[in-house]
Amino acid sequence: MFNKKQARLRRARKTRAKIAELKAVRLCVNRTNCHIYAQIISPCGGKVLASASTLDTDVRKDLANGGNKAAATTIGKLIAERAKAAGIEQVAFDRSGLQYHGRIQALAEAAREGGLKF
């Protein structure tokens, strides 16, 4: 049977396959214990159009900890800003098989407040 990681990766593959059928720009989110990452990826070719993470130097100055909801909210607002600068309004949310809860939810809500539609 599956262990926890294999089940998450399976969910991620299924989601990415559905997004690929739509041919939509996707907002891909990844998290670790200490950091959170967000990338806007083009539908064809997998090219990164915009990105933000808690590892960015300008973000690190403002945050004491990169692995909490406050950091996720900051990254959500920043990725929405950078997406608008790249001319992107509509995205598909790819949560990488992670549960829509906690830091993932905080990032998504902040991105929506920043003007991204998904």
Curated annotation (Swiss-Prot):
Signal peptide limits: none
CDD domains: Ribosomal_L18_L5e
Keywords in alphabetical order: Ribonucleoprotein, Ribosomal protein, RNA-binding, rRNA-binding
Pfam families attached to this UniProt entry: Ribosomal_L18p (PF00861)
GO biological process: translation
InterPro entries: Ribosomal_uL18_bac-type, Ribosomal_uL18_bac/euk
Gene Ontology CC annotations of this record: cytosolic large ribosomal subunit
Gene Ontology molecular function: any one: 5S rRNA binding
Keyword Ribosomal protein: yes
Purpose of the protein: This is one of the proteins that bind and probably mediate the attachment of the 5S RNA into the large ribosomal subunit, where it forms part of the central protuberance.
Homology family: Belongs to the universal ribosomal protein uL18 family.
Subunit structure: Part of the 50S ribosomal subunit; part of the 5S rRNA/L5/L18/L25 subcomplex. Contacts the 5S and 23S rRNAs.
Protein name, entry field: Large ribosomal subunit protein uL18
